[in-house]
C-alpha cells in the first residue's frame, strides 16, 4: 500500500504541499484532482523521490520508499522525458533493462506493450517523429514495463484521441484487476468518475476532500433537478425567478428539498416528458470543494507572484 503521510514542501516562500496525507491500496484506482497549481505534480514527484520533502514521509507497504521500492513503481510524468532520436522499441527495451528485466524479458515486454497500445507499426520510428498522442502512448508504455506494483500517472489522458482514451482506460482497469495500486491525475472529471473508485482533491497544497466517489456525491449538500419539456418552455420555479424558454432546465437545490412542488409548477408551465433528481456529478463536487473549475488556477499571493515558482 502507498501511504503519503503529512508531507510538506516549500519552494522559497511558496507552500507547494501543506501536510498532505492519503493512501492508495493494491487493486485501487484513485483519482488525484485539483485545479492548476494545486500541488498534484509536486506530490507525485515526491512519491517517486524526485523531490526532497521538508516534512512527512512516503511509504510503500509500511516502509519508507527507497530505490528498491521504486523499481516496482511505474511513473508517467506530465512532461515527456524521452530521448527524441531513439527508436520507440529501443526506448522501451532500454527502460525495461533499467527496471531490472533481462534482455529477453525486456524485448518481450516492449513488444507486448507496443502491440497492446497500437504502436507496433511505429516500433522503428524515432520518438520525435511521432505525434503528441503517440508520444503519450510511448510514455505510458514506459510506465507499464515490468508489471509495476504502483502506477503514478500525471495527466495520462492529455492529448489522446477518443480511441486512445478507451484503450488506456481498458489498460488501467486491467492493471487494477491484477492488483496494482494506481494513482492518476486528470482534468477530465467525467472520465475520472467512470474509472476511479476514490478521489483525493487538493487545493493550494492541501487536501480539501477525499473518499469514495459515490460517498462524496451522496454527502454533497446540493442536489440537481433536471426537467425536460416537450418543447422550449419558459418556467418560473417557486422562489427562483423566471427562466427563459428551453427544453431542459437544470436546478441546483439544497439536499432534502421537496421536489414535488417544483415538478408541479413545471407541469403547469408545459408538458414535462422526463425529469431526474439526484446528487451532483463529480465536477460539481469538485467545484463545491475548491470554489472554482478544475482548469482555473488560484490567484497568486504576493509571495507566489514574486517567487517565480508555482505549484503543479
Describe every region a protein language model picked out.
Residues 140:
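Hydrophobic anchor residue at the start of the ABC signature
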Residues 222-292:
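Short, charged/small-residue-rich alpha-helical element at the C-terminal edge
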Residues 55-69:
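Conserved ABC transporter NBD signature motif
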Residues 93, 97, 105-122:
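Conserved ABC ATPase "signature" region
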Residues 151-155:
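Catalytic Walker B motif of ABC-type/P-loop ATPase nucleotide-binding domains
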Residues 169-254:
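ABC transporter nucleotide-binding domain
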Amino acid at each position: 500500500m502507498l501511504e503519503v503521510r503529512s508531507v510538506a514542501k516549500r519552494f522559497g516562500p511558496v507552500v507547494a504541499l501543506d501536510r498532505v496525507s492519503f493512501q492508495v491500496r493494491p487493486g485501487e484506482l484513485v483519482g488525484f484532482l485539483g485545479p492548476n497549481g494545486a500541488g498534484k505534480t509536486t506530490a507525485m514527484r515526491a512519491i517517486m523521490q524526485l523531490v526532497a520533502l521538508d516534512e512527512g514521509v512516503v511509504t510503500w507497504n509500511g516502509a519508507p520508499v527507497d530505490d528498491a521500492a521504486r523499481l516496482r513503481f511505474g511513473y508517467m510524468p506530465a512532461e515527456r522525458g524521452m530521448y527524441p532520436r531513439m527508436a520507440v522499441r529501443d526506448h522501451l527495451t532500454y527502460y525495461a533493462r533499467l527496471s531490472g528485466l533481462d534482455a529477453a524479458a525486456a524485448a518481450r515486454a516492449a513488444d507486448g506493450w507496443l502491440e497492446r497500445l497500437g504502436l507496433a507499426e511505429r516500433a522503428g520510428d524515432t520518438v520525435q517523429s511521432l505525434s503528441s498522442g503517440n508520444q503519450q502512448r510511448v510514455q505510458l508504455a514506459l510506465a507499464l514495463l515490468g508489471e509495476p506494483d504502483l502506477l503514478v500517472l500525471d495527466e495520462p489522458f492529455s492529448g489522446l484521441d477518443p480511441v486512445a482514451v478507451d484503450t488506456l482506460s481498458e489498460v488501467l482497469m486491467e492493471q487494477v484487476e491484477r492488483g496494482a495500486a494506481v494513482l492518476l491525475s486528470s482534468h477530465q472529471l467525467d472520465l475520472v468518475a467512470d474509472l476511479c473508485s476514490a478521489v483525493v482533491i487538493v487545493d493550494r497544497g492541501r487536501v480539501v476532500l477525499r473518499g469514495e466517489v459515490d460517498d462524496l456525491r451522496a454527502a454533497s449538500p446540493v442536489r440537481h433537478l433536471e426537467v425536460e419539456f416537450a418543447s422550449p418552455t419558459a418556467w418560473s420555479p417557486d422562489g427562483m425567478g423566471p427562466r427563459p424558454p428551453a427544453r431542459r432546465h437544470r436546478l441546483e437545490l439544497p439536499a432534502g428539498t421537496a421536489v414535488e412542488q417544483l415538478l408541479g409548477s413545471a407541469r403547469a408551465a408545459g408538458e414535462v416528458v422526463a425529469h431526474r433528481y439526484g446528487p451532483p456529478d463529480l465536477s460539481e463536487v469538485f467545484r463545491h470543494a475548491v470554489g472554482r473549475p478544475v482548469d482555473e488556477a488560484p490567484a497568486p499571493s504576493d509571495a507566489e507572484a514574486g517567487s517565480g515558482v508555482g505549484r503543479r
